[in-house]
A protein has these predicted regions:
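N-terminal glycine-rich anion-binding loop in soluble enzyme alpha/beta folds
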Residues: 42-43, 47, 51-93
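Positively charged N-terminal leader segments that act as targeting/secretion signals
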Residues: 1-11, 23-24
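Short, hydrophobic/glycine-enriched beta-strand segments
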Residues: 31-38
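Acidic, Ser/Pro/Thr-rich low-complexity regulatory regions
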Residues: 170-342
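Short catalytic/ligand-binding loop motif for oxyanion handling, primarily in non-cytosolic enzymes
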Residues: 42, 76-77, 133-137, 179-182
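N-terminal glycine-rich phosphate/adenylate-binding segment common to multiple enzyme folds
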Residues: 111-144
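Short amphipathic alpha-helices and their capping/turn segments at secondary-structure boundaries
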Residues: 26-27, 54-64, 111-123
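Divalent-metal-activated hydrolytic enzyme cores
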Residues: 93-111, 121, 147-214
């Protein structure tokens, strides 16, 4: 089903988004870019699509998707000859796989740069794997004869997007089938959305410090060395006269830290740290039960949700202002049902 513009609204299947007078999508949802074929758009070279159920069925209540098909964006029709990446010397070009004449590298690069320059408002991007325009990693690259391909490339659109917006969470549809990668991607888009909201409301040192404080436990679960380094950067915020410049650097460092997948060991350390807050409130049986759940998670016999659920119960019973504000316990809407399987 094709997209259409109707009276200022962008209609895509069951999704409707309001456009403002400049054409930008306005929504209360989190803005996320996506390869159009992943929403079920019949825009692929063969007239098909690669509908991603996770995006369409699970993320859509929370996310305002902004679909792009770079190959149609440069004027190619549907259907069309397949494209592929070709390496000649040190240069990689985008060409038709049926060997017809035509180097699409420059036009695709120009289109990708124009698009990327207007996407700073996005909080994430989901791209189509293996695509010579959109693939994020391990895209096939052929030699000049169309042979000897190696899975070593990146699609031109995604390459430009990631170099222009290096802080932006980008993932492929295939990788999002991995529960931990899926969880990490959702976590990052929510963290960036909240950070962008602070800038929209007017940057202050206090607001940035409060934001960082809310994310401390979550950051600790990702990387202890990077957590400490980012903490030193935040402590030095008073040395920056230009808060916009500070925001740009903080955003890059924060999103780089969150891109590290959290480890079981780091999660265990965070859980044990939080356990210490209830040292005086819990009786012996309760302390033993909590310690047993944390150890069960450490040994992979309990999912992360088990100790977190018990900790949240104790947080409600014995309120602590610092813990109640920590995004570690609620990094995304509970209805997304992440953290359930590990």
């Amino acid at each position: 089903k094709k997209a259409a513009d109707i009276s200022g609204f962008f209609v895509h299947d069951s999704y409707t988004y309001l456009r403002n007078e400049k054409g930008a999508i306005m929504s209360e949802k989190i803005p996320v870019g996506i390869s159009a074929c992943l929403l079920g758009e019949a825009v692929r070279y063969d007239g098909g699509h690669k509908r991603l159920a996770f995006a369409v069925e699970e993320l859509s209540p929370w996310v305002a998707f902004e679909p792009v098909c770079p190959e149609m964006g440069i004027g190619l029709p549907v259907p069309r000859p397949a494209l592929h990446l070709v390496k000649e010397g040190e240069a990689v070009s985008l060409r038709f796989s049926d060997k017809r004449e035509g180097d699409l590298t420059d036009v695709m690069t120009a289109f990708s740069q124009r698009q990327s320059n207007r996407l700073e408002h996005l909080c994430g991007y989901i791209v189509c794997a293996k695509s010579p325009s959109c693939g994020m990693e391990r895209v096939r690259v052929y030699d000049a004869e169309g042979k000897n391909n190696r899975k070593a490339g990146r699609g031109i659109f995604t390459s430009v997007l990631m170099s222009t917006l290096p802080w932006l969470p980008v993932e492929e549809d295939g990788r999002l089938h991995d529960p931990q990668i899926r969880e990490n991607f959702v976590e990052r888009i929510y963290a960036l959305h909240e950070l962008n909201g602070i800038r929209q409301q007017g940057l202050t040192r206090g607001a940035l410090i409060d934001y960082h404080s809310r994310y401390k436990l979550l950051l600790l679960a990702h990387s202890q060395p990077d957590y400490r380094e980012l903490g030193r950067f935040v402590a030095a915020i008073g040395e920056w006269q230009d808060l916009q410049a500070y925001f740009v650097e903080y955003r890059l460092r924060l999103m780089s830290l969150l891109a590290h997948l959290p480890s079981r060991r780091n999660h265990t350390n965070v859980l044990m740290h939080v356990q210490g807050y209830f040292r005086t409130q819990l009786n012996s049986r309760q302390r033993q039960e909590l310690a047993s759940l944390i150890d069960g998670y450490r040994r992979s016999t309990q999912p992360l949700l088990a100790p977190i659920t018990l900790l949240k119960h104790y947080m409600a019973e014995y309120p602590d202002a610092y813990l109640s504000g920590q995004r570690y316990f609620n990094p995304w809407p509970e209805a997304l049902r992440l953290r359930y399987g590990r």
